[in-house]
Amino acid sequence: MKQHQSADNSQGQLYIVPTPIGNLADITQRALEVLQAVDLIAAEDTRHTGLLLQHFGINARLFALHDHNEQQKAETLLAKLQEGQNIALVSDAGTPLINDPGYHLVRTCREAGIRVVPLPGPCAAITALSAAGLPSDRFCYEGFLPAKSKGRRDALKAIEAEPRTLIFYESTHRLLDSLEDIVAVLGESRYVVLARELTKTWETIHGAPVGELLAWVKEDENRRKGEMVLIVEGHKAQEEDLPADALRTLALLQAELPLKKAAALAAEIHGVKKNALYKYALEQQG
């Protein structure tokens, strides 16, 4: 379905409003103005947001919108927008929709022609990336890793060869297990940055090969407390890495030709080193 934003002034607007991830001084002037002006604020946790609004002296009507009710309540909020009410969407901390509720509401509004107005602001993933010292021109945000070890390892194996910098959120009680799984799947030399309690009093940003990082975290239980972001170095292509299409060609040729000849032809077709393909084929056989 095509999505467009309405210029109909009789309809309200949905504002996507980031809130601080720790330091309350990080809220923007524009965010405060919007929160003060809207008719309704849709919040992940109305008690938490109520305290934030109280701190800034803002009196506003709050509407609970969370993972368990979003699909049902999206239509309720859409009706209010169509009546001309302006609504702000906030999460407990950071930018809404980034690992927080809001997707169904935003999509519902866009499909109905309601204008969605995004405000820039705090985001733990981007804040951590900016200080990690890892390539930031291309990165991949993965949210939380699965809760159980098998799921985590399967997820890590699926992105093992991903060259982009990887960003994960992690919880205090799973940090050690996740780091151990990263060591097991990606290897202890993969560089990882742990950013915890960003913008807060005990903010810590520490990077090291993940085997060393795991040992560092184990040394002090305080190092695994708080809100966590893991920034993982992307896979670095090695000279011996072989493209998947070259390996498929090699397998087809091996069925009809001697191994050495098959490796030579596959190498010529794909522009890779003959010896590397030949070595790979020998390893597969033995």
Curated annotation (Swiss-Prot):
Q: Catalysed reaction per UniProt?
A: cytidine(1402) in 16S rRNA + S-adenosyl-L-methionine = 2'-O-methylcytidine(1402) in 16S rRNA + S-adenosyl-L-homocysteine + H(+)
What's a single GO MF annotation on this record?
protein homodimerization activity
Q: What is its main location?
A: cytoplasm
**Where in the cell does this protein reside?**
Cytoplasm
UniProt keyword list? Cytoplasm, Methyltransferase, rRNA processing, S-adenosyl-L-methionine, Transferase
Name one process (GO BP) from the record: rRNA processing
In terms of superkingdom, the source organism counts as: Bacteria
Which EC numbers characterise this protein's activity in its record? Answer: 2.1.1.198
Its Gene Ontology cellular component terms are:
cytoplasm
Pfam families xref list: RsmI_C, TP_methylase
Protein's job: Catalyzes the 2'-O-methylation of the ribose of cytidine 1402 (C1402) in 16S rRNA. In vitro, active on the assembled 30S subunit, but not naked 16S rRNA or 70S ribosomes.
Similarity comment: family membership: Belongs to the methyltransferase superfamily. RsmI family.
Q: What is this protein called?
A: Ribosomal RNA small subunit methyltransferase I
Gene behind this chain? rsmI
